[in-house]
Amino acid sequence: MGAETMESPSLFLCKGLLLTASLLICWNWSTAALLTSKEMRFSAAEGAKVLLSVPDQEENLLSFSWYKGKDVNENFTIAHYKKSSDSLQLGKKVSGREEIYKDGSMMLRAITLEDTGFYTLQTFKAHGQQEVTHVHLQVYKIVTKPYLQLNHTRLKRKSASILTCVSPDTGVDINWFFNYKPLNATERITLSPEKRELTISPVWRADVGIYLCEVSNSFSSKKSYPLLMALAYG
């Protein structure tokens, strides 16, 4: 019976890295397999372009492949580049919006919410070095411009007024403005739990003016057109 070979221990490190779009990078180094495993995170707004770039890839680079998802599998190949022949082969998961660069980076153009997920870069370098980088892309929705609705077109003093911030977006933050300054809630001026409705009861002369609402998420914000609230007399 042959002698058993003891597998070399691996070292796992996880360190924060501050980049323009990257949030986290971790790596797992195995001296036995000369294999390095990393994870990076990027975020961008829908409709934009984003460069998925892994640092320090160009030196001693022989070839690399990009995959859709976390599996290194031919069926999920986006593209494969071979330096010796300067050739680029497209795979089954190419969408036509990719640009592949010789340093191993990949540009995605006109990204959509469906592009959110993992991408994997596999690189082969001199001396048998292999590196696998899992890149997570988070695509954020650009919010839609909201608009204001008023429950009555003719308001009278001491009546109740309800303004509604209308937006098709969900999971957003809503802020209100009066005469272009942040509006503070009071006993008379209250907000619904999701802040989509602003109720003024009773309406006073001091409430006459311009109202706006703003819808925002982590990546974008938009304000409604101003609405002038006035009182009717007689």
UniProtKB/Swiss-Prot annotation:
SMART domains: IG (SM00409), IGc2 (SM00408). Detected in placenta. Residues 146-226 form the Ig-like C2-type domain. PROSITE patterns: IG_LIKE. Glycans are attached at residues 28, 75, 151, 184. Disulfide bonds join 165-213. Pfam families: I-set (PF07679), V-set (PF07686). Keywords: Disulfide bond, Glycoprotein, Immunoglobulin domain, Signal. Belongs to the immunoglobulin superfamily. CEA family. This is Cell adhesion molecule CEACAM15. It comes from Mus musculus (Mouse).
